[in-house]
Amino acid sequence: MKKILLTILIIITILSINVMAVDIDIGEPAINRGSTASTYTWVNIGNPANGSGTITSIEIWASTALTNCEVATFYVVSGNNLSTRDSELIGSVIANSKQTFAVNLDVQAGDYIGAYYTVGALERDSSGFVGCWMNTVDRIPCTNVLFTLRDGEAISLYGIGTTGEEEAINSLFFGTNF
């Protein structure tokens, strides 16, 4: 009888372990780079979102302190015309190190990550990457706005998140979301 109860307890324990969410990542690493990006709206083209769900954390590296920094997920309407899917104000960002912020941004597979700030500069590389889109004014939020393509560039803006698949998997096994 003890063996049966122990076996049942082990099975319940194994089944109640929360299944880890599948990670989403978007953007280029938040690192010290060779140039800077002034107060425009910048969108990384490299490393579009590899899944749909929620971006929960943003990493950013400013070369000079940022003020009124907004981050957003963008999608291509056509050509170099972009729209925002979701955005969030993260506020001030201190300079010269990677800073991490908790966010709650909707994202779809293939989306891009971008930022705008009223003061300061992001770390930027001017060559060796896929590129960035840039617009000279605040385009967070925006709908079907033309951006300028900057080939080879990258800004230090990166996000990670979850697909929300853990809830679906748990509900399959247990009949409810955890």
Language model features with spans:
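Beta-sheet-rich sandwich/jelly-roll-like modules and their strand-loop junctions
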Residues: 20-87, 103-112, 116-167
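Short proline/glycine- and polar residue-rich coil/turn motifs
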Residues: 90-97
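Short alpha-helix capping/helix-loop boundary micro-motifs
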Residues: 99-101
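Viral virion structural and adsorption modules
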Residues: 167-178
